[in-house]
Amino acid sequence: MSTVLEKATTAAQQGNWSLLNQYLQQLPLGKNATDADAESAPLNDSDLEQVLNLALDVLDAGDFQERWEVAKVFPKLGAIAIAPLIELLEDDEADLEMRWFAGRILGEFNHPTVITSLVHLLKTSEDEDLTAMAAAALSSLGNSAVDALASLLADPESRLLATQSLSQIRRPEIIAPLLSVVHDPEASVRSTAIEALSSFHDPRIPPVLLDALDDHAAAVRKEAVIGLGLRSDLWEELDLLNRLKLLLYDFNREVCQQAAIALGRSGTDEAADALFDVLKSPATPVPLQIDFVRALGWVKTPKTLDYLQQTLTEASVECALEIVRVLGRIEEPVLKTRATHILIDFLNSEYPAAKTAIIKQALAQAWGELGEIGAIDALVGLLAEPTDSVRLHAIAALKNFPTTHQQLEQLAADENLTPALKQGVAIALAEWKI
């Protein structure tokens, strides 16, 4: 036994993991094995077994930094480290951080057993850190991991797991094996493959995504819509407007929702037309109406504001609330003034939704975000509201305008104010001083 190994053993007996790490780093392992000096003579198999056990002791009892340092030792030990590391990785009772390090270290070993173990962890673990580590480890193994997983696609029993594992390795090498399962009988296999393939800009993929729009499984259609929605570069070439707007009528809400998002991101009036056609239909349920309102908000054109204004006239409170919020988030200067006046007209209307406190509160917040001086009079009017939350939101919005404090002081001296407004102005001025 070398002198350094003897010192390492003593440090382990003392529980001095930091010192043990220092000695382990000095041992002639891996590339350093041929550079041994008198103190660190070449190690035999028995010595290597002892080094492995010492390193495992640090992994078991050390703190994060000590585990981080000892992780560098295991790859130098070679294949003898694989089995005990896999045992740690698969021990559900073991410390999660230790299992995380075991998996991370295994990512340094390009070995079929390692790949199988990491794949199993991806399938069974409910801990996000562990599964993320396993995916990263598989990715670091590169083509060998892809080849091993691709071979599992031939077996129906392992196909879903292999597809899920391949989907975690975002490398171009996974495209071909995943393309081989996009028509698999199992919907979960198809949807997983479609989701992963959508990450790549490869000419083989768009036709697959278009075909998947007609899949009988909603999960597959949903992933295809999401993937195509990210391909703005192919919007006209693939006629995505006409392909995706059909999915606005899908029986599955999540598919409809993703189709609306994709159309909204396109930012075209034609997309707004398609969204409004469904939004105004009495058959469209309120949750979907809200999704479509949000999507219209992303289009950001004057026509969008026209459609949102028309929708306000017959909207439920829930839908009207979302429209108010969407209009309040308008950032384009040319549209802000229009949005402000749409909201003012709505407040002054006889529509039932406009009379509710929650809508008035949202109106105040929207005007504060828009920052258009044309909303000041409407905000002052809200100070007369009997609901505290409406008044407080109006006050908060008024503080965004530099001249309103002076205007409120002048109003406070006006004897013609209604008692409710006079009280609201007084409260606002008092709040201003806080």
Located regions from the model:
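Short, positively charged, low-complexity/disordered linker segments
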Residues: 380-396
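Structural detector for internal amphipathic alpha-helices that build alpha-solenoid repeat scaffolds
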Residues: 10, 21-46, 66-79, 97-111, ...
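N-terminal accessory/assembly segment that mediates macromolecular interactions
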Residues: 60-61, 72
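Surface-exposed polar/charged interaction patches
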Residues: 11-14, 26, 30, 91, ...
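Short inter-helical turns and helix N-cap capping residues of alpha-solenoid HEAT/ARM repeat scaffolds
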Residues: 15-16, 62-63, 92-95, 125-127, ...
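Amphipathic alpha-helical scaffolding segments comprising HEAT/armadillo-like alpha-solenoid repeats
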Residues: 3-6, 43-60, 79-91, 111-125, ...
